[in-house]
Curated annotation (Swiss-Prot):
Catalytic activity: Hydrolyzes Xaa-Pro-|- bonds to release unblocked, N-terminal dipeptides from substrates including Ala-Pro-|-p-nitroanilide and (sequentially) Tyr-Pro-|-Phe-Pro-|-Gly-Pro-|-Ile
Name of this chain's protein: Xaa-Pro dipeptidyl-peptidase
PANTHER family cross-referenced by the UniProt entry: COCE_NOND FAMILY, PUTATIVE (AFU_ORTHOLOGUE AFUA_7G00600)-RELATED, PEPTIDASE S9 PROLYL OLIGOPEPTIDASE
Function: Removes N-terminal dipeptides sequentially from polypeptides having unsubstituted N-termini provided that the penultimate residue is proline.
Annotated HAMAP family: Aminopeptidase_S15
Active site: S347, D467, H497
Highest taxon above the source species: Bacteria
Chief place where the protein resides: cytoplasm
Amino acid sequence: MRYNQFSYIPTKPNEAFEELKGLGFPLNKKNSDKANLEAFLRHSFLNQTDTDYALSLLIVDAKTDALTFFKSNSDLTLENLQWIYLQLLGFIPFVDFKDPKAFLQDINFPVSYDNIFQSLHHLLACRGKSGNTLIDQLVADGLLHADNHYHFFNGKSLATFNTNQLIREVVYVETSLDTMSSGEHDLVKVNIIRPTTEHTIPTMMTASPYHQGINDPAADQKTYQMEGALAVKQPKHIQVDTKPFKEEVKHPSKLPISPATESFTHIDSYSLNDYFLSRGFANIYVSGVGTAGSTGFMTSGDYQQIQSFKAVIDWLNGKVTAFTSHKRDKQVKANWSNGLVATTGKSYLGTMSTGLATTGVEGLKVIIAEAAISTWYDYYRENGLVCSPGGYPGEDLDVLTELTYSRNLLAGDYIKNNDCYQALLNEQSKAIDRQSGDYNQYWHDRNYLTHVNNVKSRVVYTHGLQDWNVKPRHVYKVFNALPQTIKKHLFLHQGQHVYMHNWQSIDFRESMNALLSQELLGIDNHFQLEEVIWQDNTTEQTWQVLDAFGGNHQEQIGLGDSKKLIDNHYDKEAFDTYCKDFNVFKNDLFKGNNKTNQITINLPLKKNYLLNGQCKLHLRVKTSDKKAILSAQILDYGPKKRFKDTPTIKFLNSLDNGKNFAREALRELPFTKDHYRVISKGVLNLQNRTDLLTIEAIEPEQWFDIEFSLQPSIYQLSKGDNLRIILYTTDFEHTIRDNASYSITVDLSQSYLTIPTNQGN
């Protein structure tokens, strides 16, 4: 374990003393540090009346137990504090450490010892070996009662809301939409979980089209074959129009007011929401139009879908109506809500957070968007090509519609509405235009970057630099496009398409607690969070602060002095093998074992680089045909320790999200010996070589120059590292698999790579 603490708010000695006293610790400024430490320890043994025995189980040095020490006349030393602090945080002497000073240095322990009250205060805010902060562990053990009132420590809400007395209710929010032309406004089902309290409370909202169920068989049947011919396109310039965001003005309902009349027993919850539920935040889960319990069509990513989620935030602020049922005869008021909302969730869920933020909806104070899509074209297409998300060849937006249109999972709904649904789905399948792979109005209507200037909320993004599902370009684009007037924060980790709130190496939960206590509960805690926090790829459990995602300097590296050719065609056996399992293709590609058609360029580095942003390949090429795919990957190649991309369990169910509530595993990315690491990659239709909206003809055997931007990353490279560039045609994981007989020739003497860095790195 190594500490990377971003959540602690520096506290003055007097303030620390008052907070400790407020928690019930019997401290006294007139007493010695030793006496105050003993009082602190005895009060911490919440489940034991025999505190002498509890003290006797702690040690203050390699030979003395704490009970003996406190009965003696020995002075309290720094070494004594170090032994005790480590034990309070769950580290075991003679197992985890023998020399506390050296161990504390190794784990980057953030606590100082100048003032006993400041020191104990900071200690309480530190995470233990199990992942829980000491204060959270003590509250769970009974330091404070679950009295359904707010209690704070170091600017963060504590788990004092009773999760055994939760209210679970369902309402149906009326939208301004009619996505299936039914003649009625679409209703959206909302599942609410909230503590029983007299306070008006903020809301953690997860907008998840998956939460009411998914239709795997329909999606599987809809999934496309990737084998086919790459189209030769007519040269043209694509025209699109940005439509202003607008919706029908709603007026207050005059219907009778009623409490919610529908409840539920269970819903798959997001554990970060659970953490905040026990701290006085309501949790709501909304699947939006076209899902089970709601009405309407699954419009998949456009602003109609976004509006269906926006209506829920408007209801929390008293602006639209929610009904007790589909009868629409009684309304429910959100009189428990303070109107302030934070959205949460990963992937599609985080994507809806971005879309909501771009509406500028009142009441949305914070989005916590993890691995979020910023433009749907970049999810299912790339540079004029159909480009499946990593791991899902053949998926497209209409396949996702089939997966998430969960109304068809309800038989009565199916027989009434499936014909209309199928007609709308067919229209969607035509609009996505798999034949050309080009940008068009349909994709433009699902590009949230067009409305990013409307964002008013505070923004928190997390993204994996090894996420080839929702690729890093999504967060790179949106984060750098956000208005300068808002506060924005970005956590970039070395994992794939995963959550990071339950990792051992970073206090993400506690940082979000400080931020949401500030923004949604109005606590003036002076919390400041850095703009870009990046997981260092060279060292285990180490996070660094950067000024920006994207460097201000470009380093140029030549690619060689020869001309090399890439064949596209494979023999039938090899082609069928790679089509059957794209992982076989990737393995052969990265090994460079002459089984795949590729150009491999090894670039031994002559100095250190902190790669920060989008690498670009500047290539002089010619092709033998009027169509061609060019794919590229950049690898850090050669044996050394690197991160795996999927976190593994450190301790099972050790993370407590309240008082023994919704426990989950503590995880971390393994750091092990490996042969290579993908830094970046990309694919390009050479007919779209200038920009996304311009289609140009290819003249066979005629040289032309291209600039090819790859996926952005932040990656520390060292002098002597081998940077491997692989150039090839068909990517069997992502692109159309056209086995046509064409080739691409690259003039390496006229080609180079640019690496984005910060000046001086």
